[in-house]
Amino acid sequence: MEKFYDEIVSVKAREVLDSRGNPTVEAEVTLSTGVTGSAIVPSGASTGKFEALELRDGNKDYYMGKGVTKAVNNVNNIIEQEVVGLNAFDQVNVDRVMLDLDGTENKENLGANAILAVSMAAARAAANSLGLPLYKYLGGVNAKVLPVPMMNIINGGQHADNNLDIQEFMIMPAGFNSFKDALRAGAEVFHNLKNILKKEGHITSVGDEGGFAPNLNSNEEAIKYIIRAIQAAGYEPGKQIFIAMDAAASEFYNEETKKYSVDGKEMSAAELAEYYISLIDKYPIKSLEDPFDQDDWEGYSEFTAKVGDRVQIVGDDLYVTNVKRLQKGIDLKATNSILIKLNQIGSVTETLDAIELAYKNNMTAVVSHRSGETEDSFIADLVVAVNAGFIKTGSLSRTDRIAKYNQLLRIEDELGSTAQYRGLNAFYSIKK
């Protein structure tokens, strides 16, 4: 018998709600020692077309078609039978059994939401069985790096009902010595931004990810407001706090005309690149995600060749946490960073594989939430486990976002003097 062995004795799933009030899957795995682990999967709004399939019921009379009873039943009636009896400490095997059972490239038979819920719950159960925090179980003795938070404080695009094309305007408090100080600085900027927007007559209600969603004259105006908020909080833009953007460009790309619609103008990929470069030259922008359409490999490669030595270019919809697409990006030098979302690929093992491939090719990895989140803080442990250096988990409001920040505070506290906050050194894929 293997030295570390704790058998899965039951797997149960149920339908619960995410932060948007839509159903999602929660799974609970019980081991032979009586230990349990549970996990809830998130759900995205601006989804890449190459993502693994999130199985929804499609019954318009039940949660407006968004029910997940099919996925829940797949866990309870199909997956459980196959994973009961497996060793919970063999995560790769647990995941492989589920992937083989599904048998499709994009998990369309069982649903990525069904497989991932069990995958995450099994990892939690195994960690609990050993009495280890999840980040130590997943990452081992060297898990010690706290991430630079990329805080989405102004929302646009698919995440808000306003007129901004760019989906996320984020702050990155990279010029600090600890996660705790970085988080505080971010919160102070968030509150100052609220005061400034309020004073100038803007609505300060928040979007899906907890950021503000004002109607502004242009995307650049959002950056200007953030710069003012950083200064009002007593910090220096470009020294302590930097700016990041997620364009989510596939959302404003017209496949027929091959043009991008930004600030009311139709632009080619080359014109859009020049637009981004003009912003990068003007403001302390350190990271830019999904600047082009998810099929525009050429646009990415040309842009990364131009500015990849000074900006982190992150592929999200481009890669969908998929090693095959990531390998293509590596071959084409498409980006110098990848966004990591567990539910884009649908298992813990495949997520770790994507991170490993990125690291081997000197790319950074940004671990990310989805716009439809829950109280589950798995990604906070994951980002420390793999020493990723960056996390995207929303703004400084809404419990579904704060749950991750609070878990990171706990982890930093627990690691004590061994905790590392790399700050600007986390940007290793940008040629210094």
Curated annotation (Swiss-Prot):
Catalysed conversion reaction: (2R)-2-phosphoglycerate = phosphoenolpyruvate + H2O
Keywords, alphabetical: Cytoplasm, Glycolysis, Lyase, Magnesium, Metal-binding, Secreted
CDD domains tied to this protein: enolase
Ligand binding (Mg(2+)): D246, E289, D316
Positions contributing to (2R)-2-phosphoglycerate binding: Q167, K341, R370, S371, K392
SUPFAM superfamilies the record matches: Enolase C-terminal domain-like (SSF51604), Enolase N-terminal domain-like (SSF54826)
Gene Ontology BP, a term: glycolytic process
Compartment(s) of residence: Cytoplasm; Secreted; Cell surface
UniProt pathway annotation: Carbohydrate degradation; glycolysis; pyruvate from D-glyceraldehyde 3-phosphate: step 4/5
Leading EC class: lyase
Annotated cofactor note: Binds a second Mg(2+) ion via substrate during catalysis.
InterPro entries tied to this protein: Enolase (IPR000941), Enolase-like_C_sf (IPR036849), Enolase-like_N (IPR029017), Enolase_C (IPR020810), Enolase_CS (IPR020809), Enolase_N (IPR020811)
Named cofactor requirement(s): Mg(2+)
Active-site annotation: E209, K341
GO molecular function terms attached to this record: magnesium ion binding; phosphopyruvate hydratase activity
EC numbers: 4.2.1.11
Function: Catalyzes the reversible conversion of 2-phosphoglycerate (2-PG) into phosphoenolpyruvate (PEP). It is essential for the degradation of carbohydrates via glycolysis.
PANTHER family the UniProt entry points to: ENOLASE
UniProt cross-references to HAMAP family, sorted A to Z: Enolase
Family: Belongs to the enolase family.
Protein name per Swiss-Prot or TrEMBL: Enolase
Organism for this UniProt entry: Petrotoga mobilis (strain DSM 10674 / SJ95)
